[in-house]
């Protein structure tokens, strides 16, 4: 399933009267407001993919935008980004054939670990920075980076992390200024909530939020009332609460401060962040913080709340059932793959189906983290230098 550049949409959108003549649908991985994602085996090769099935009636009036954005996604090729492999069209459906992920979700892996350190978090963030830097060089802004969109490539202990879900991604330039309020509450940058024009810096803010969560297990901004939550984000005031941050290095906190900087012009870029000692040096500590972080993840990101349309563990379950286990990683054909098109709103195209933040009822994209704020505070940061 080669992806080539310079093609018209008609040449890369393959016609299929009956998709099931090409793929054998194995199992439903998830459903959303506009689509269904299924585990599918390509009959000609035996390769496994995740196929997102979108009824054309859901696309009505949005065809042009969707085609433009799919064309953008087809240009992306990076080892830490889930790939769009192919596109089929039938009289009634559009089918997006995605790389299939088999390693499960980020939070699951952290909770299941017996040992987890700052160094582990630093390694994760380094991979995210590398992938997002690639996107930014391509002129693409993801706009919905969050832990739920970070998946493991395989079951392997040293598996790389993959960025998924480009439902809200957007190309910079071409004369248009990004100003649509979209993303997931709790991870969006202040300038997005302020409805100001914004840039790729919004992704860097989100990476800072993710790094924060990876080091303590709860989000930097929390309130059961969305308006108050947005107020906190707009002010960029967050805390390094005791006792949760007592064993975290000053270098890690400095790294987060530079990404969660209120002023996007002063905020670290991906390139700057990748050069920070916490990423590029030896300042990330090797002390085991698993007990504290995993306990907070269990408390604040309950599976039933933060898992949305795509259930990555269904892939693992199905593979085990088919006894594909060890052959997956060694096979050059079948499943060296990964997926997730599951965004909170199951968005289909960046410019057409952005979820307006003001209408969201969830907190931080996980339904609601019902975490009481710790009463002892070791440090408060205003998000502005």
Curated annotation (Swiss-Prot):
Q: What is this protein called?
A: Calcium/calmodulin-dependent protein kinase type 1D
| Domain annotation Protein kinase: ranges | 23-279
Domain comment quoted from the record? The autoinhibitory domain overlaps with the calmodulin binding region and interacts in the inactive folded state with the catalytic domain as a pseudosubstrate.
Which segment of this protein is annotated as the motif Nuclear export signal? Answer: 318-324
Main location class: cytoplasm
Function (record text): Calcium/calmodulin-dependent protein kinase that operates in the calcium-triggered CaMKK-CaMK1 signaling cascade and, upon calcium influx, activates CREB-dependent gene transcription, regulates calcium-mediated granulocyte function and respiratory burst and promotes basal dendritic growth of hippocampal neurons. In neutrophil cells, required for cytokine-induced proliferative responses and activation of the respiratory burst. Activates the transcription factor CREB1 in hippocampal neuron nuclei. May play a role in apoptosis of erythroleukemia cells.
- What processes in GO biological process is this protein linked to? inflammatory response; negative regulation of apoptotic process; nervous system development; positive regulation of apoptotic process; positive regulation of CREB transcription factor activity; positive regulation of neuron projection development; positive regulation of neutrophil chemotaxis; positive regulation of phagocytosis
Instruction: Give the family this protein belongs to, as stated in its UniProt record.
Output: Belongs to the protein kinase superfamily. CAMK Ser/Thr protein kinase family. CaMK subfamily.
Positions of crosslink type Glycyl lysine isopeptide (Lys-Gly) (interchain with G-Cter in SUMO2): 113
The enzyme class is transferase
InterPro entries linked to this entry: Kinase-like_dom_sf, Prot_kinase_dom, Protein_kinase_ATP_BS, Ser/Thr_kinase_AS
Q: Which organism is it from?
A: Homo sapiens (Human)
Q: ATP-binding: present as a keyword of the record?
A: yes
Any one GO MF annotation of this record: calcium/calmodulin-dependent protein kinase activity
Q: Please give the residue positions where the record annotates the modification Phosphoserine.
A: 122
């Amino acid at each position: 399933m080669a992806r080539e550049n310079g093609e018209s949409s008609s040449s890369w959108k393959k016609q299929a009267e009956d998709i099931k003549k090409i793929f054998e649908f194995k199992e439903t991985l998830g459903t959303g407001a506009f689509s269904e994602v299924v585990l599918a085996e390509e009959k000609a090769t035996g390769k496994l993919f995740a196929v997102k099935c979108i009824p054309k009636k859901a696309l009505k009036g949005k065809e042009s935008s969707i085609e433009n954005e799919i064309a953008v996604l087809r240009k992306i090729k990076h080892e830490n980004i889930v790939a769009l492999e192919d596109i089929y069209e039938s009289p009634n459906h559009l089918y997006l054939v995605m790389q299939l992920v088999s390693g499960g979700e980020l939070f699951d892996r952290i909770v299941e670990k017996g040992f987890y350190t700052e160094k582990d978090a630093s390694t994760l963030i380094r991979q995210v920075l590398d992938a997002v830097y690639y996107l930014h060089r391509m002129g693409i802004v993801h706009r919905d980076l969050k832990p739920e969109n970070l998946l493991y490539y395989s079951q392997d202990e040293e598996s790389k992390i993959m960025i998924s879900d480009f439902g809200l991604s957007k190309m910079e330039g071409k004369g248009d200024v990004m100003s649509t309020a979209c993303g997931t509450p709790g991870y969006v940058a202040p300038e997005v909530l302020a409805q100001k024009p914004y840039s790729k810096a919004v992704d860097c803010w989100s990476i800072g939020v993710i790094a924060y969560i990876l080091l303590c297990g709860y989000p930097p901004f929390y309130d059961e009332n969305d308006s108050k939550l947005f107020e906190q984000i707009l002010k960029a005031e967050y805390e390094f609460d005791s006792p949760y941050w007592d064993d975290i290095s000053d270098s890690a906190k400095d790294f987060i401060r530079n990404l969660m900087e209120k002023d996007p012009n002063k905020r670290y870029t991906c390139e700057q962040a990748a050069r920070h000692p916490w990423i590029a040096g030896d300042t990330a500590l090797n002390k085991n913080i698993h007990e504290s972080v995993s306990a907070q993840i269990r408390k604040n990101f309950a599976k039933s709340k933060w898992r949305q349309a795509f259930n990555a563990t269904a892939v693992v379950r199905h593979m085990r059932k088919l006894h594909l286990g060890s052959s997956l990683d060694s096979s050059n054909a079948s499943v060296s793959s990964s997926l997730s098109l599951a965004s909170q709103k199951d968005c289909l195209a960046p410019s057409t189906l952005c979820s307006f933040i003001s209408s969201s009822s969830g907190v931080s994209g996980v339904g609601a983290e019902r975490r009481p704020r710790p009463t002892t505070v070791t440090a408060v940061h205003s998000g502005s230098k």
